[in-house]
C-alpha cells in the first residue's frame, strides 16, 4: 500500500473549455490555495491557463 503523506492528486483543467486536462500532485500543507498554471493545450494548439479541479 502507498504511504500516506500530504500530497494529493489534482486535475488541472483548461480554461479554453476544450475538455483537456493534466493530472498532477500537490502538497496541500505548503500550497493550500488553488493552483493556476500556464500549460500547452494541444486542442487549441496554444498555451492557456489551467486551473485546479478535484479528481472524481
Curated annotation (Swiss-Prot):
The keyword Ribonucleoprotein applies. GO terms for cellular component: cytosolic large ribosomal subunit. One of its GO terms (molecular function) is structural constituent of ribosome. It comes from the Bacteria. Signal peptide: none annotated. Gene3D superfamilies: Ribosomal protein L33. InterPro entries: Ribosomal_bL33, Ribosomal_bL33_CS, Ribosomal_bL33_sf, Ribosomal_zn-bd. Keywords: Ribonucleoprotein, Ribosomal protein. GO terms for biological process: translation. NCBIfam families: PRK00595.1, rpmG_bact. Belongs to the bacterial ribosomal protein bL33 family. This is Large ribosomal subunit protein bL33. The lineage of its organism: Bacteria, Pseudomonadati, Pseudomonadota, Gammaproteobacteria, Pasteurellales. The gene is rpmG.
Amino acid at each position: 500500500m502507498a504511504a500516506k503523506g500530504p500530497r494529493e492528486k489534482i486535475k488541472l483543467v483548461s480554461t479554453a473549455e476544450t475538455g483537456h486536462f493534466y493530472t498532477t500532485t500537490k502538497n496541500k500543507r505548503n500550497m493550500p490555495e488553488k493552483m493556476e498554471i500556464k500549460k500547452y493545450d494541444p486542442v487549441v494548439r496554444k498555451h492557456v491557463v489551467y486551473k485546479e479541479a478535484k479528481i472524481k
